[in-house]
Amino acid sequence: MAVGKNKGLSKGGKKGGKKKVVDPFSRKDWYDVKAPNMFQTRQIGKTLVNRTQGQRIASDYLKGRVFEVSLADLQKDIDPERSFRKFRLIAEDVQDRNVLCNFHGMDLTTDKYRSMVKKWQTLIEAIVEAKTVDGYLLRVFCIGFTFKDQQSQRKTCYAQQSQVRKIRARMTDIITNEVSGADLKQLVNKLALDSIAKDIEKSCQRIYPLHDVYIRKVKVLKKPRFDISKLLELHGDGGGKTTEAVVSAEGAVIDRPEGYEPPVQEAV
């Protein structure tokens, strides 16, 4: 064994030494996520973001986040007909420590969608693009299945192609009329109550009996230009004031006069 100096020990070990461990959560803040007033549950959760440092503004990193929430949680309802619907809400603005969200889409859970597909029946689906009164372009997916008559001795309940085309045309007409004749808030209420699917099922009974008719998915393809007053109106404000309206922790909007400045704190 060669006898000599250990260069690593003489120089004080490895380069840099032991680094100081910094908790990443010490640089982050919690923000409350607020749903529009069309839902009973206003605060749907909290989200994390890094604090504002220099040109990195925290609100810029919050805008555009999408939150997926069950309709049963939004409406405080344990009805199983609501639990399999998921609503997507997108963060559009930040007021104080509150993230104001707007409707961004709807979908069914995977287990519900797969449980409906069975043998010996015909699946009928329609895809419709329509624009609401306030300028939202939506793509709506509707699904339905043929229903076997209890008095029938046949094992199957397949519909003819002519009947499928008539049902799909009826679906398209009803969805187009419902979407184009309502604004976004009214349409979300219809989706929550599932009134469009019920109208389709009732209207198509004369062509062929249907069951499990649902609005399977809704996508927002295009939105109008962002308007803070309309967003505050969705969250409970009348839209009279713009930037002076602030949402409190309980979800209520507080109006502040123009030129309002917070008082200067003597101690921090």
Swiss-Prot record:
Coiled coil: none annotated. It is found in: Cytoplasm. Keywords: Cytoplasm, Developmental protein, Differentiation, Oogenesis, Ribonucleoprotein, Ribosomal protein. Signal peptide: none annotated. GO terms for molecular function: structural constituent of ribosome. PROSITE patterns: RIBOSOMAL_S3AE. GO terms for cellular component: cytosolic small ribosomal subunit. GO terms for biological process: oogenesis; translation. Residues 1-21 are annotated as: Disordered. The keyword Cytoplasm applies. Its main location: cytoplasm. Pfam families: Ribosomal_S3Ae (PF01015). InterPro entries: Ribosomal_eS1 (IPR001593), Ribosomal_eS1_CS (IPR018281), Ribosomal_eS1_euk (IPR027500). Belongs to the eukaryotic ribosomal protein eS1 family. Component of the small ribosomal subunit. Mature ribosomes consist of a small (40S) and a large (60S) subunit. The 40S subunit contains about 33 different proteins and 1 molecule of RNA (18S). The 60S subunit contains about 49 different proteins and 3 molecules of RNA (28S, 5.8S and 5S). Essential for oogenesis; required for late follicle cell development. HAMAP family: Ribosomal_eS1_euk. This is Small ribosomal subunit protein eS1. It comes from Drosophila mojavensis.
